[in-house]
Amino acid sequence: MKNIFKLQRICFYLFIVIMVVNFIFSLSFMTDYDDLFGFELEANKSIKIFHGNMQAFNKVIFYLSLVGAIAIAVVFILELNHKVPDRFAIIVITAIALVLAFQAIYSFIKFGSLMNEYKNVNFSYMWLENSKLDADYVYEPKHLIFYLGYVVNALVLLISIAFPSVLLISHKDYIKQGKEEAVLNA
């Protein structure tokens, strides 16, 4: 019982750290792409469309990451760092984990499509709408944030599976131990 409870506490703290990282990632997702904002000319239409798609995706992952941020308060309220979970706690954490798993899977799919779209954007006319750029300016695509997104969402998916699983095992182990003690005391 002590080992599984120790694992529960480790998952508890990992959950908190990963949810904070996930929230920070959702806030910072678009910062590398601020130079793609405000294009209106027909020649830069692909940039405008791509930026709009990125904004829409960013909005979704922000709201989904809020679930994780709120979940931090929930795990403290349920006292999962120093208490064996009851059925209610398991159901609540499992529901939260399902939303977070959806976020991770959605993000994996969307990162792939956005990266593919990013490859096809024509950046050669950016200089027409940006006085800071010369006509021979070459835009360098930035993929780091996508790769970080894969890592962050992989961690979200892993903890979304691990934490409820460990809570369920802890709960069942506690019930089993209680039944064994009841038989011994009878």
Predicted feature locations:
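Alpha-helical transmembrane segments of polytopic membrane proteins
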Residues: 58-67, 145-156
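Membrane-interfacial loop-to-transmembrane alpha-helix junctions, especially the N-terminal start
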Residues: 5-12, 34-38, 88-90
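Alpha-helical transmembrane segments and their immediate interhelical/interface regions
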Residues: 46-85
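Interfacial non-cytosolic loop connecting adjacent transmembrane helices
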Residues: 32-58, 107-148
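Hydrophobic alpha-helical membrane-insertion segments
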Residues: 13-28, 92-113
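Cytosolic juxtamembrane helix at the C-terminal end of the final transmembrane segment
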Residues: 2-7, 74-88, 108-122, 155-186
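Alpha-helical transmembrane segments
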Residues: 18-24, 67-75, 99-105, 155-165
